[in-house]
Amino acid sequence: MNTPQLLINNAKQYPNEPAISIKDANEEWKTDNWSEFFDYTMEISKSLISLGMRPNEKISIYSYNRKEWYGCYLAAQMSNIVGVGVYHTCSSDEVEWVVGNSESRIVFVGNNPNDNDDVEKMPNHRLLNVIDKLNQVDVVVMMDGIDTLDSEKAITWEEFIAKGETTNESEVLERVDAIKPEDTSCLIYTSGTTGNPKGVELTHKNWNCELDSVEDSFNFEQGERYVSWLPLAHVFGQLVDNHYWARKAMHLHVVNSPLFVVDYAKEVKPHLFIGVPRIYEKIYSNLKAAIDGKA
């Protein structure tokens, strides 16, 4: 099964089991079960279709990890649309390049948890600086709680969801049924070390091959806990957070800032935790300092 089919299956097989948990402004966990998260994703899919998005067209998601990121990405998958992740730290020039080069028609804009209230580091303001140059962008959707751009292309999250009210779920499910293994699932942009970043095309078949390889080495069970903190624009984050999560129907806990990943891990006690070498060096240093302090 491809990832959209996995999401549908999870909603049927584990409707009341926890799917995704995110802390609210009061630091309280808010959890969607698989049935609720499927409905949430379906609403987004319907709105994408109502806005005229056709198979193989692109959307960009410019934000750090949050519920809308997962919903928009999987909604694109369900609609046979291509998702393009944009790092939450990207500058105006960088976001202009990725959105423009990918020919994204819709851009979803969220937050940068490390902006320190500096307007110039906020994704909405960085996109505003270049939106007039992105002629192929039809709509900019502000994620929940994000200030709306001063642009005629910008709409709120509520306005976006309302667009899909007249679209039938059957239209989305027909698109799921029409997905072929060789259809493009997403574009992941390279770091651009030697020039402008290049969009790497990954198909639904690519993801399934990756997931099969992971399962040859590791096996986690439905409902086991996982902490999401690697940026979802990164291939490792997308593999585990968006695809392996759905395949194994794990319970995803979303970190609201990469600065707090260790604190979240202590609280959640995840069965699965992924990271880059630097985070493990930090954990080791903290543990060693604590042990040495007790010696």
Residue ranges of predicted features:
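A short N-terminal helical cap/helix-turn-helix that marks the beginning
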Residues: M1-I20
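Conserved pre-ATP/AMP-binding loop-to-beta segment of ANL
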Residues: P15-P18, M142, A154-I155, E165-Y189, ...
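Conserved AMP-binding/adenylate-forming core of the ANL superfamily
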Residues: N16, I20-R66, Y70-L74, S91-E96, ...
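Conserved AMP-binding A3 loop
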Residues: T31-S35, S185-L211
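A short helix-loop-beta submotif of the ANL/AMP-binding
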Residues: E57-K58, Y64-S92, G100-I106, E224-R225, ...
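ATP-dependent adenylate-forming carboxylate-activation enzymes
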Residues: S63-Y64, V84-G100, N111-K121, M250-V268, ...
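Structural core segment of the AMP-binding/adenylate-forming
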Residues: M78-A162
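Conserved AMP-binding/adenylation subdomain of ANL enzymes
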Residues: N208-R225, L232-A295
